[in-house]
């Protein structure tokens, strides 16, 4: 037998290895790759996308308007909005029945309760815009400075909320005298005094 460099074999798969070319019948092994490694690679490709898909919805209500519309507590995404914006809205709809808890949604996107930055993190994760939950302090440095066309995150020490396609995703009713603290959509404007406005690049 003769040893041949891996050549066109993917460099990110066993990069320091060489494969062995056996001069045998076609039915016999040509690339003696560890079966356990192959199994892990295949399962990773199948299971991980499925888990992500189960956590965040791929569809939801839409509206023909240019901005999101609130219907019985659920937001309908603008038909013309980019897919990431729609997915952020549909994901945030799932949190409307969740209670508020300080630190909620930070150990994992999937939680029983959420705080302000955990709520915003969840919506952005569904859109593929964050890879892990972020705190209010971290959101002050997120993306680019200023309001976005579709998504704007308002962050300061201790609180974060977002405006997505014209609706405010917040955990406080703002006036602090009515309602209760919980992830909710609000049509009412909240003055951003003291907040840093940030937005995802391109949105």
Which stretches of residues belong to each language-model region?
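Short, positively charged and aromatic/hydrophobic N-terminal segments
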Residues: 18-22, 29-30
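N-terminal hydrophobic targeting signals that begin at the initiator methionine
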Residues: 2, 31-34
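Cationic, amphipathic, low-complexity segments that mediate targeting or membrane/lipid association
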Residues: 3-7, 14-16
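Intrinsically disordered, low-complexity
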Residues: 34-100, 175-203
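Secreted/periplasmic proteins that engage bacterial cell-wall peptidoglycan
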Residues: 82-143
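...with weaker cross-activation on analogous glycine-rich loops/strands in unrelated enzymes
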Residues: 89, 121, 127-203
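Polybasic, lysine-rich low-complexity intrinsically disordered segments
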Residues: 11-12, 24
């Amino acid at each position: 037998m003769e040893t041949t460099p891996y050549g066109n074999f993917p460099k990110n798969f066993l990069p320091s290895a060489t494969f062995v070319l056996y001069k045998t019948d076609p039915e016999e092994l040509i690339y003696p790759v560890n079966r356990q490694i192959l199994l892990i690679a295949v399962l990773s490709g199948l299971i991980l996308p499925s888990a992500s898909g189960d956590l965040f919805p791929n569809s939801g209500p839409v509206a023909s308007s240019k901005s999101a519309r609130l219907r019985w507590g659920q937001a309908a995404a603008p038909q013309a909005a980019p897919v990431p914006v729609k997915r952020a809205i549909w994901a945030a709809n799932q949190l409307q029945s969740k209670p508020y808890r300080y630190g909620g949604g930070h150990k994992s996107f999937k939680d029983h309760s959420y705080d302000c930055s955990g709520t915003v993190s969840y919506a952005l994760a569904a859109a593929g815009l964050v890879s892990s939950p972020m705190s209010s302090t971290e959101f002050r440095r997120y993306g680019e400075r200023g309001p976005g066309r579709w998504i704007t995150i308002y962050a300061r020490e201790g609180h974060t909320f977002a405006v997505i396609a014209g609706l405010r995703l917040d955990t406080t009713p703002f006036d602090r005298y009515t309602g209760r603290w919980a992830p909710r959509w609000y049509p009412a404007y909240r003055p951003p005094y003291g907040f840093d406005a940030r937005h995802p690049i391109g949105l």
